[in-house]
Structure formats: C-alpha cells, structure tokens
Amino acid sequence: MEKGTEHKSNVTLQSFTSSSTHQERLTPMMEQYIEIKAVNNDCLLFYRMGDFYELFFNDAIIASQALGITLTTRGKHLGKDIPMCGVPVHSADDYLQKLIACGYRVAVCEQMEDPAEAKKRGSKSIVQREVVRLVTPGTITEEKLLDPTRANYLMTLARIKTSDREEFALSWIDISTGIFRVTESHHEKLLTDIMRVDPQEVIVADSLLHDKSLKSLFNVLGHIISPQSATLFDTITAEHDICNYFKLSTLEGVADYSRPELSAIAAAIRYIEKTQITHRPPLMRPERQNEKATLFIDAATRLNLELIRTTSGQRDGSLLKTIDRTVTGGGSRLLADRLISPLTSPEAIDKRLDSIAFFLRNTSLSEAAHLILKGGPDMSRAVSRLALGRGEPRDIATIRRGFEIISELNQLLNNKLLPQEISDVKEVFSRLPTALHIRLNQALTDDLPLLKRDGGFIRPNYHQELDKMRNLRDESRRIIAELQVRYAKETDIKTLKIKHNNVLGYFIEVTTLQASALTNNPQAKAHFIHRQTIANAMRFTTTELAELESRIAHAANHVITLELEIFDMLVNEIIAQADFIRKVSEALAVLDVSVALAYLAEEQGYCRPIIDNSLTFHITAGRHPVVEQALRKQAIEPFVANDCNLSAKNNHQYAAIWLLTGPNMGGKSTFLRQNALIAIMAQMGSFVPATSAHIGVVDRLFSRVGASDDLARGRSTFMMEMVETATILNHASSHSLVILDEIGRGTSTFDGLSIAWAAVEYLHEVNHCRAILATHFHEMTALTKKLDRLHNVTMKVKNWEGNVIFLHEVTEGAADRSYGVQVAKLAGLPEEVITRATDVLHQLEQSEMAGKGHKLIDDLPLFNLQTISTTHKKTDKYDAIKEALKNIHPDELSPKDALEELYRLKKLEKESSL
C-alpha cells in the first residue's frame, strides 16, 4: 500500500469507534463492517452486500480514485455523510487487478449465509460475514489477474542478527504454480538477488524498516515491500510449521536448511496461511539455490543489458521479448527463468543445447510438437486455483486438455533416439494417470460454462441420479407447456400464457379485458387465484401450478447440487495428482522452450556455442540479437557482424583485454552489449547470434554501459559510475567478463583519464579477467606497450566528401579522433555551431593543453554578432545558389535559356558576397 494510506485509514476507524458508543448508535451492518475492518486495517475491505462488494470511509475514497468509479454516500456519522463506493461481484476481478497493480492489498469479505437463514435467528439478525481471503500482489491466482508469460513471486526477506554478524536469506514462491525456492544472501548482494527474481511482493519484518543499513534497499524496492509482524519470522517453531505444511515428520534427510533459510521459508508459509485463510496451495518443497551454479549478474548489469525489460520498464525491446518463440505460458516463464539465471556447468548447458540441436535436425518432429503445444493450457495454475477453492469448470477442462496434449506428445516422441533432457520429458509424459484422464473425458461436456453455479458441465449418462433429476426438471417444463394449453382451452382464453419471473415464480397471465372470465366466474375464481395486476394484464396461479413449480424448483436445485458434488469429487482426484501435474507442466515447458529455441536458431541463423571451463572467449561474426531483429523489421541495412577474441594469446595464462576506441555513433556500445548478451544466451543453453562461438564459462558478468543518476539515493551519474566500477574491481575473477563503456567520463578530463588508466591496469594485473573497455581517452592506447594482454581495437570509419561514414566494423588499431563534431552535424545542430566547433577543435588540436589555457582562450573569442552574422550570410548565400540550381533542368533548356540561367547564377553570387 502506498505510504500514508494505512495511517489515514486507521485514523478514520479509530475516531469512528471511539466516539460511536456515546455519540450515536451504529446500524448492525455498520457495526459488523467496523469490527471486520479493524482486524484487516492494512487492507481495503471488499464487504459483500448482495451482488456488490462495497467499501466505506477512507477505503471508499481510495478505491474510487484508483478505480475511477463513482463515490457516493450511505448513512451518516457524527453528522457527516459516510463515503461509499461499490463494484459488482461478477466483475470484481477486473477491479482487483487495478488495485493490485497500484500496490494495494484487499480483504475479501463474503456472506456466509443468505438473508433467509439470518432471519431464522431473529428478525433483527444480520447476515454472517467473514474475510475468506486477503488478495495481495504476491498471492494472486486468478487467470484475469496474472500475466501468463510471467511468474508471480512472493518473496520473504529474513535476517538473523547476532552480536558479531548478520545473516540473510530469501525465499520466494509462486503460489499459482507451486514453485518454492530459497537461498542465503548477504547485505551487499541483497538487491542483486531480489532484482534477479523480480518479485511482486517482498515480506519483511516491520522492525527492519527502522534499520538504517537497509533504508536504501527499501527505498529502491518501493511499494512492493510489505511489512509484517516479526513473529512471522520466528525460528523457534519454524521447522515444526514447515513439516506440518508439507506433512513431514522431520526435515532430516530432506534438506539441511540454515537458520536464516528456515526463517524465510517459515515466514512464506505463514503468510500464505494468513492470506489464504482456510486453503493451502500445493507447493514444491523449498529448493535451495546454489549461487555458484548460476552466472552472477548484478542489478546494474541486468538493467544495462535490458534482459527482461528495457531501462524504461517496457518488455518490448528487451532480450526476452526478442528471443521468445514459446507458445505456452509455462514455456515463456521457463525461458525467462533461464535467462535470469544462466548456468555455469558446461555439462548442464550442453544438455539444453543437445535438445535444440535435436529439434534442428528433426524439423518435421519439431513442427509437429510446435503445433500440438500451441496454445497449450496452463495446468499448474489451474490446479492451484482448484486447490484454493477458486476453480471453475474450465480449470478442470484445462487439466483434461493438458492430458490430451501429453498423450499426443508422448506418442509423437515414441521410438525416437532422444537427447537426455527430452528423454526425461518423455519419461514424465509416460506416467500420465490414464484413469483420471478417462474419467474427465466421460464426465465433462465439450462446451463448459464459465461458472460452476450455472451447471450444465456434466455429460448425460455419466451419473444416474443426475440424469433422473434432469429428466424430472425437463419433463416438468413439458408439463407446464401442456398445462398452458389445457388452461387456455378450459377458460376459452386463447392468449393465456404461463410465464416465470424471479419474484412470482410461475404464473398465469391474461389481458385485463379477458380477466373477467376468471374473476367473475365463481367456479373459475375458486380455481384461479389472483396474484398481481399490472398495466393491461392480470396474473393468477393455481394449486396445481404451485405444486408443479415446487417440483421443478426442487429438481433444478437438486441438479445443481449433484453437479457441484461431482465437481468436488473430480477436483479432489485432480488435487491428488497435483505433484504429477506440476512435474508434467514443467516437462511441457522444457519441451516448449527447446522447440522454440530451435525455431529461433533456424529463423535467425544462430550457431551452437562451444562451452567449457577454459578462459576462452572467441566469437566469430557476432551480432546483437535485439538490434539485428529491429533492423530487419525496419528493412534497414543488415546488421554488421564483428569478431571478438579475448582468449589468451602467446601462451599467456590469462585472457586478453580489448581497449576499444572509435567515433561516437560508431557502434562501440552495441559491440560491448552484444558480446555480453552472447555469453548470457550461451550459458542459458541457447544457440547464439554468431557464425561460431567458443566460450569458457563466465562466473560473473559485469556491465557498466550507459549513464544514469540514482536520485533516490542522492547519487550523481559519476558517483553511480564509480560505485559500479568499484563493485567490478572488487569482485571480478579470471573467469569473469567485464564490459565497461567510457569509464571516467562523468568528471574532468584528467580525473577521468587517471581513473580509467588505473582501472585498466588493475583489471589486467589483479583481476586477470576477460574484458572489453570502450574509451574516448585516446592517450590510453599507449598502455598496450606496457600491458602485454591489452589489445587496441577500433571502430572503422570512412571520410567521404567532408562527411564521416560509420562502417560499424571492429578492426585492430586505435582511433586518433572521436568525430564528435561530425556526429553533432548529423544530429542537426545549427551550421554556425558546427562551423564554430570545427574552428575550436582545430585550434585545440594545434595547442598543448597544459600551461597554455589562457593563450587558447585569447585566441578563441566567444560568439559575437559579427561571427554569427557572417556565418548566416554564408549560409544564405549557399542556400540561394543551391535553390537556384535545384530548379534548373538542363535537358529542357535551349542554348539561349542556358546562357540566361548562367548570368542569373553569376548575379546571385555577386549579391551574396556584398
């Protein structure tokens, strides 16, 4: 919830409850509301009133603004109107989605009985209501509220502090799929670990909010932080609570969790029990994440490289969006998971690459699998909704359709020599619970209603008693039709109709003119009982019709009751198979990702990388995957591929460092990023945009590309640059890959050059890492004489008729200039500015900077009116002549006309020079 909202809501209720006892009497309904709201004061309360959820007081003001709905009033308190707004129950999910997106938490309060049951306890009794669920950003499961391509993680942050140290752990759960993971962390790594998972809600002990050392972290995370009572993280009963949830007698032999990990896991479980009230989602046992098993990518690097979203927060333009060819929600989520956590084991990476290679070789099999998978149902999320009591017939249909797809894919993969990863998938498919699959096919109709309360989702001939009740219901309706014919004949009123509405039930309707035949005839009057008079018509009933209506209602209600009982039986059978459904969902996702990456490799011309434990980094004809596809879509010139070889040379123990110089707009930043992205794609187990690639596993990837302020923490661009550079120099190893773009540019020339110089030496002599460093400090190219593993490379350019052409090719050597003025000209700076800048640059290049600054200033006076005027005159002269030449068409001129045009041009030249 946004800061200040909770406090404001508390004040409203406190003032209300403290004064209500002696100021004025509350209505019973409002007393009930206040009582329930007081227990859920950190949430907006959706209070069920018939077909609406209503909100009151400050909740109503907040919701009306967030949802754009009308704010009205209901009743008064202390002489003031009570604010109120409401949303229809049938469309509540749409409104919940908006509130959750704004960071609010919502308590859903339902009616636990109907008004008729309440009245049995007394005429003044009110309907019993209870909060059945807390809806928070990290605990949603509704299909409408979830992005099918994105995991929805709830994270807990636990800290165990002793006198001499503090330990941290993070656990995260997606209750919509059952994923449950945990890892240890430390203070410096917390932000990186949290950003990698990208949770929608982070649970922390409220006591941590006052810890100054964590303040900057919480400021960055913003509204996704959800403070809870510190008792949620209690470790005394943590093991007991975990065992109780997973129905284990002990954790021994299951996992050896540390104390911080136990605290984080227990907090997650307790929070789920708190928000889900009576239901427990089927979760995997917490899987410990080994930080050494994945490529470490810090928060700044993830942002700079735009892996999941761009720096502006958009998915379009990110690497994930560019390479995603999956066709299922689970496949898309798995692809994102692999992208944020690339592997460091060559064996594990090769298993994934083998799967892609297999489908590239077997294109017909790949196409068939792709067609079967296309639009495949999200079984893991469906079973979670069913387990939480939020399932509908279409969720069961999702399981049925999923089983059909598994059966088809299992048959497709039969008798094939499969790679290990796909063989494991096939093994899971072969364990399909056939009996349940058959039962679902037998029980469910083909076209299912949206809501189970509507009925009609169980096939005829599946359940004998249900068929009997349906026949009775349908037969009664036929009898109604026959009764109408008989009554019309008996009364001689041909227009007599038997109708139905929710107020009167079944009734006989005749026009007012014909009603006298029933009201004036004593015999008819005794038989036809008057119910209602409306404009132009009168309504009646009979004892026979009332009894028939009772039988119809009983049969119809019994039909719904039986269908719901069958629904619950099927749900229980499905939940009993929850572990299998989760595993088979994972297998479907693996297959989808493998087929999709094979499709991507074929479509884009990617190659299989060689991955080992060496210090090699050799990319031939590498391309930037995002830029390349963008250029192709825009039908612009093709992307220029470039080699990159950071491998050790001349029997050196350690790998090389490239110092990249060249012009602005030459493609330096693109080249830097593309090599980082190629490394990530290779280690996530994907083919890569290159002709060939040999990469020794990268343990840590650091990228300092682009400039940005950290205003939230009061850091300038230069300070941010230095903080990120410090992280690199302090943590990079010989197996790391470092990408640095123009280090030191945020300060004065000499300061920046000095820092960049020292950083390169440190990377070379201490870190021994593979690195590409782009710079405009051309003085640094001299370092290659001192540092034998440092190599100069530059971006090629071509000068043509005074203009610079960027070739975007990387070649050996060093640039002697940056072509900044030429780039400024391309950007459209005024011509007088370009002319002036050229003059200044020329004189600067002719002078020695040190000791001659004052003379240089004297030689270069500031802009003055004469300079600008002269420049404008030159510009006007050239523009006039150009315009005249543009309007001349030589092929259409006679010799006389040509001579006249020549004289006119000469006259223009004279006038322009005055």
Curated annotation (Swiss-Prot):
A GO BP annotation: mismatch repair
Annotated stretches, region: Disordered: 1-23
Molecular function, one GO term: ATP binding
Listed InterPro entries: DNA_mismatch_repair_MutS, DNA_mismatch_repair_MutS-lik_N, DNA_mismatch_repair_MutS/MSH, DNA_mismatch_repair_MutS_C, DNA_mismatch_repair_MutS_clamp, DNA_mismatch_repair_MutS_core, DNA_mismatch_repair_MutS_N, DNA_mismatch_repair_MutS_sf
GO cellular component, one term: cytosol
Top-level division of the source organism's lineage: Bacteria
Residues that, per the record, bind ATP: G662, P663, N664, M665, G666, G667, K668, S669
The entry's keywords: ATP-binding, DNA damage, DNA repair, DNA-binding, Nucleotide-binding
Cited CDD domains: ABC_MutS1
Biased composition (Polar residues): 10-21
Pfam families (UniProt xref): MutS_I, MutS_II, MutS_III, MutS_IV, MutS_V
Role according to the record: This protein is involved in the repair of mismatches in DNA. It is possible that it carries out the mismatch recognition step. This protein has a weak ATPase activity.
Family designation: Belongs to the DNA mismatch repair MutS family.
HAMAP family in UniProt: MutS
Name the record gives this protein: DNA mismatch repair protein MutS
Organism: Bartonella bacilliformis (strain ATCC 35685 / KC583 / Herrer 020/F12,63)
Record gene name: mutS
